[in-house]
């Protein structure tokens, strides 16, 4: 096998850290391919690279620096250093791989010159964000393995197509693998993926993108094709980002700005992971932990931006992630999103926020320890959204459990424990069914209502269980209709247990027990309503004194029918209909 490996030292490539090695390296690689070598070995040493050499006049990073031919493996000793010579160009490439196939680059260190760079004025290119460590354009079957890349004025690695998708000469990059690399301190992004099919980034350390004099967007990994309106000129599809460690990247760890079919799995991250305007993104099994000493600016663990122009849905799945220490755990935006089996803790603002979204299912998540000295934390929140389902979630130790402002909602089979205010519907229409609500002597702030419906919101409050409350378990002040059906309220200690004001309401088949230590409690109090129905309820007064089981004297035309009342009375209005009630 040795005869198929060309040692760059034998070819006379300088590695003294004083002599420009670029032209000699290019000659070495070209000779290796022409003579049938499959591998070129670079031994220990410092190789100075003119990353501007040969660059295209319009795209200075193209055909610049070390030009890697196809069907070749470049192997570098761990102490082989490829060091870019300081320059003033707005764009360059240490290694350029263009329209080639079957290439491996492994080992060694590729070091840029961001700290020595001269940031000369360059018009629209004045950001100098196109200085790359490895630039891959329109290639197939490329592997970057165990390479340390740092300190570039643009990106450590960029994977792009050659040409535009609207032209016949468009050539995407496909079957690209970046693994076991360390990519650090790029001014723009550590890795950019702009146009591709089948790219994998795995088991890498991706650190400190955009720090210092960084330039936007400052992402660990940016998956972002160029497009205008609903036309894609570059298309990143089928990308897997898995089992990487992200540390200290300024704006986000991974952002799928507009890619298709993106998997982000099993990563460790201290900053945001975003599905952006992407389509068919799966974010699963990641550990997101915000350090306690991190910057105080609000941060979101997992987020999105919305539906891409020209597309109908986001089709995103956010599943099985562990998120702790962020201001907001998950911020959902777009259409057709599933958020399931995530665990979110130690947040200040919101566990899961659904904002300007539709067709979103939030199912089976555990949200806990939402405590803040400056704001009321919220476990689940929906704002300006429609067709949203909050199902089977467990919310523990939050100030406000569920807060809804607008749209149609289903809130079903959730467990809320240790909260101040449980479920609050401020706008829209909600079905609140099968939930268990237990404030359980919450002490962080004074206890408020377990379920409340206000303003002009409407709700069906059905088959819920209320335990250990010290304030209204059900409070409605809405002008719209509510139906309160089949709920179970245990041992109320309150002077008034259910308070309903204004609107027209149905209060059917609820089971309520009351045990107040002083005074005469009122169990159902209907105030300022006209034409409501109270029927089939079982009210069991365990208090020493007699209770007013149903009070409607400040409402009109109420129908009080078929209720079972133990140790209580009815205080009605003269216009009410009373029939078939059993009072014991």
UniProtKB/Swiss-Prot annotation:
Keyword Iron set for record: no
Keyword Repeat recorded: yes
Record keywords, A-Z: Repeat
Domain of life: Bacteria
PbH1 repeats (start-end): 100-128, 139-161, 173-195, 196-225, 236-266, 313-333, 334-356, 357-382, 406-427, 456-478, 529-554
Gene3D superfamilies in the record: Single-stranded right-handed beta-helix, Pectin lyase-like
InterPro entries to which the protein is assigned, alphabetical: Beta_helix, Carb-bd_sugar_hydrolysis-dom, PbH1, Pectin_lyas_fold, Pectin_lyase_fold/virulence, RHGA/B-epi-like_pectate_lyase
A UniProt-annotated Pfam family: Beta_helix
Protein name: Uncharacterized protein YclG
Annotated organism of origin: Bacillus subtilis (strain 168)
